Amino acid sequence: MNPDNTIAVITETIPIGMQFDKVYLSTFNMWREILSNTTKTLDISSFYWSLSDEVGTNFGTIILNEIVQLPKRGVRVRVAVNKSNKPLKDVERLQMAGVEVRYIDITNILGGVLHTKFWISDNTHIYLGSANMDWRSLTQVKELGIAIFNNRNLAADLTQIFEVYWYLGVNNLPYNWKNFYPSYYNTDHPLSINVSGVPHSVFIASAPQQLCTMERTNDLTALLSCIRNASKFVYVSVMNFIPIIYSKAGKILFWPYIEDELRRSAIDRQVSVKLLISCWQRSSFIMRNFLRSIAMLKSKNIDIEVKLFIVPDADPPIPYSRVNHAKYMVTDKTAYIGTSNWTGNYFTDTCGASINITPDDGLGLRQQLEDIFMRDWNSKYSYELYDTSPTKRCKLLKNMKQCTNDIYCDEIQPEKEIPEYSLE
């Protein structure tokens, strides 16, 4: 690694069995690259750990073993993980190896979870993306993230978010806690970096607002700004898109901020909008009608489209896998790579983060993300909302083996809606 240059790389996991003409550096290989070059410190923010319970490959075990070896090399490793009611044997193994671990009880503080997924190596290199510390995220779940090397300024800014989590692992929030962990960059004052000789503006946003310092851009604000600043197109690839908040009392509340901004951009400014939403057996049924209402806007003067992305099943099936888990957006100006699903609670009471990058020439990383989106959009794994699915993989499409007519299929009753955090 050349310490004089910032290097930024898009990473992805393509589930075993899926085929594309072009793929980018794998999450597995990128994580190994980071681990092999870590010499002093490694901080990891994680939702949960399940690297060792794998089937068919040993990618997860390799990553876990390499992390376990770091303390023996004199590396200080800190892991912030969402507090769970179930024991995490991977985490217990980390602790036995000398890794410092803190369980973060966001549920008790805000009602949500610690859903942020990022790494910080040697206070210089970072990874942020959709991949969990789960073997499935290396072989069986479609993931997307970004690694940025050799930039201490950006790493220091992300470390401030980690330090907030780390503090929450042992303390309640003090009255003036926001003075402890200031942010250095935001949407109004982004960091200027050079990637491959091209100037880029970049900042890291965080959610929820309650855990943002005065200087930190809230993730929702960053997301909406990205949409508003687009002049030609907005392409979105996320696991869930539901304009709903699930309240603690079990009620659902309408939360239209993202949907309204997308509709407004398509209608008022004639921006082309494409939504590529994941579909599998655990998809929330309520999402179907929201997506259909958006797709119905398409007309001569309104360019807005919605597709569902289905990852083919494994044989034999593997629980909690085979889904497009990515959470990103790309416009003609900016690349937005996040860790949150686009459902209200992920922005109001759940911890998440995003990297927002705008290249001066409009190309580079932004172009790569656009290419990935269009590759997936035009692939055989993408379906129109009213297509008939050849399998039972997608809960939101009619299944040709079960549906004899449209009326029967459209009258399938949705199950009781509850927040889902497993895998997500």
From Swiss-Prot:
GO CC terms of this entry: virion component
GO MF, any single term: endonuclease activity
Pfam family, any one: PLDc
Main subcellular localisation: virion
Keyword Thylakoid applies: no
Alphabetized UniProt keyword annotations: Endonuclease, Hydrolase, Nuclease, Repeat, Virion
Top-level taxon: Viruses
Cellular localization per UniProt: Virion
InterPro entries noted in UniProt: Diverse_PLD-related, PLDc_3, PLipase_D/transphosphatidylase
All residue ranges annotated as the PLD phosphodiesterase domain in the record: 110-137, 320-346
Record's note on what induces expression: Expressed in the intermediate phase of the viral replicative cycle.
Entry-linked SUPFAM superfamilies: Phospholipase D/nuclease
Function in brief: DNA nicking enzyme that cleaves extruded cruciform DNA at its tip. Probably nicks viral hairpins.
Family in the record: Belongs to the orthopoxvirus OPG042 family.
Record-linked PANTHER family: 5'-3' EXONUCLEASE PLD3, PHOSPHOLIPASE D - RELATED
Full protein name: Virion nicking-joining enzyme
Organism: Vaccinia virus (strain Copenhagen) (VACV)
Biological classification of the source: Viruses, Varidnaviria, Bamfordvirae, Nucleocytoviricota, Pokkesviricetes
